[in-house]
Amino acid sequence: MDKGSTKVKLLSLENEIIEVDEEVAKKSQLIKNMIEDTGTEDDIPIPNVKKEILLKILEYCEKHKNDNPPEIEKPLTTSNLSELVDPYDAKFIDIENLEQLFEIILAANYLDIKSLLDLACAKVATLIKNKTPDEIRKTFNIPNDFTPEEEAQIREENKWAEEATS
């Protein structure tokens, strides 16, 4: 039997089975370790990841099953991710739904898929880059719980940081 055609069954948060090529699943260090420890006969539980997110992540793993994406240069030199990564990766992570993006970050971290975690975090960084605190709050729907006096005090205490970036 061809090693590349061995299938593994992943069990999502909703207890739904997703069948995938072993080599694709092994892009996750967590799954790779589980396969090495227990084999591929039993379902592999992925209790922290919804089926929808797991399918999206497996799409990424399928694309990169035969390669390792290059490191994303840090700090980011632009807020245009397509200038920093492969066009497929830029399109893949161009997610409008921030909740889904954060679920991918959590799942990539849990599954130990460093290249996807870096990509998703870089996407978040592009949403923050060159924005004011008010713009960042608006983007991420974060309430401002500082009084104007507290904000003024914080700005004064951190004036050196603003001067360093000007």
Curated annotation (Swiss-Prot):
Keyword Ligase assigned: no
Highest taxon of the lineage: Eukaryota
CDD domains linked: BTB_POZ_SKP1 (cd18322)
Listed GO biological process terms: protein ubiquitination; ubiquitin-dependent protein catabolic process
Interaction with the F-box domain of F-box proteins: region residues: 105-166
Keywords: Ubl conjugation pathway
Biological or metabolic pathway of the protein: Protein modification; protein ubiquitination
Phenotype reported upon loss of the gene: Increased telomere length.
Family, similarity comment: Belongs to the SKP1 family.
Role this protein plays: Essential component of the SCF (SKP1-CUL1-F-box protein) ubiquitin ligase complex, which mediates the ubiquitination of proteins involved in cell cycle progression, signal transduction and transcription. In the SCF complex, serves as an adapter that links the F-box protein to CUL1. The functional specificity of the SCF complex depends on the F-box protein as substrate recognition component. Its association with the holoenzyme telomerase ribonucleoprotein complex suggests that it may play a role in turnover of holoenzyme telomerase complex components.
Assembly, per entry: Component of multiple SCF (SKP1-CUL1-F-box) E3 ubiquitin-protein ligase complexes formed of CUL1, SKP1, RBX1 and a variable F-box domain-containing protein as substrate-specific subunit.
Protein's UniProt name: S-phase kinase-associated protein 1 homolog
Source species of the chain: Tetrahymena thermophila (strain SB210)
Source organism phylogeny: Eukaryota, Sar, Alveolata, Ciliophora, Intramacronucleata
